[in-house]
Amino acid sequence: MKILVCDKTEMDAIEKMRAAGLTVDTKFEITPEELPTVLPAYDGCVVRSRTKIRQPLIDVCPNLKVIVRGGVGLDTIDAEYARLKGITVMNTPKASSASVAELTIGFMLMLARSLYKASASMKAEKWDKKAFEGDELGGKTLGIIGAGNIGKEVARRATLLGMNVIAYDPCISGAEGVKLVSLDELLAQADYITLHVPNPPETTGMLGAAEFEKMKNGVRIINCARGGIINDEALYNALTSGKVAGAALDVYNEEPPLDWKLVKLDNVICAPHIGAATREAQSRVGAEVADKLIEFARK
């Protein structure tokens, strides 16, 4: 079975697949223009968030039997179409959950204590203690939109910090230690709102101007899920008006952003989609990718 690894993947995982008898080629920097001429020769492929597998590409790959996404979301793959064509589509939903959850908590702490502003002030050789009075997370209400693997990990950590945790997720009936509420209830009650949902058409623009109006004044927003879930213009307006006190973003509508005005706001913390970028998560992702492909090849 021939596998093309299109994005950076741990070499231990690649060697594990080869040791199991798979023929594995790596083209970590393959371009969208090259894919239609290269991928048709392969039975399977491994992708991360960079490489997109869309219908036109699937149509020119008659040998393709399996696509494995190293990560959580499948929005970079036309998964339903692939399955209609008899292609198995898999991901690694739990491998990076802890890393994304820890980044989310880190973002909340930075927002609560204005650490990003305090650090910038010190680098400008200013000693301005009185300017950076913050808030404790304990006793605050955290609203989690999406109580799947990552959402549950965030909830567990937030509870240990003494936060009251509520969640909105129409896909589950219960989550340990979390009170499930409607979206409107969450928007009205939360001091911090964090997003952990995929981005199919149903969640695109899920938080827009109308939703921001329902939130508490001074709410803080964290998005480590997908950029399209929040309407950028609505978030920008809420941040500049003071409705939203601060936001922390790891994901964007376009990556890298085409418009940087949101990123440049003083009350926005930002990172270049590093939620899963820990050594531990990358090792788990690679191992799970290898195990899934080896198991598939043995069927």
Specify the residue positions occupied by each region the protein language model found.
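Phosphate-coordination loops involved in phosphoryl transfer and adenosine-cofactor binding
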Residues: 64, 138-141, 209, 218
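An N-terminal-biased, well-structured beta-alpha scaffold segment characteristic
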Residues: 1-90, 186-188, 208-210, 214
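Short beta->alpha connector loops at strand-helix junctions that form conserved
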Residues: 27-28, 48, 70-71, 87-98, ...
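Structural/interface elements that position substrates and couple domains in central-metabolism enzymes
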Residues: 2-4, 9-12, 22-26, 94-99, ...
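Glycine-rich Rossmann-fold phosphate-binding loop(s) that bind the pyrophosphate
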Residues: 147-148
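Rossmann-like adenosine-cofactor binding region
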Residues: 51-58, 164, 170-261, 277
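C-terminal helix-to-coil terminal segments
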Residues: 83, 90-103, 133, 246, ...
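Phosphate-binding beta-alpha-beta segment of Rossmann-like dinucleotide-binding domains, i.e.
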Residues: 85-87, 93-141, 153-156, 160, ...
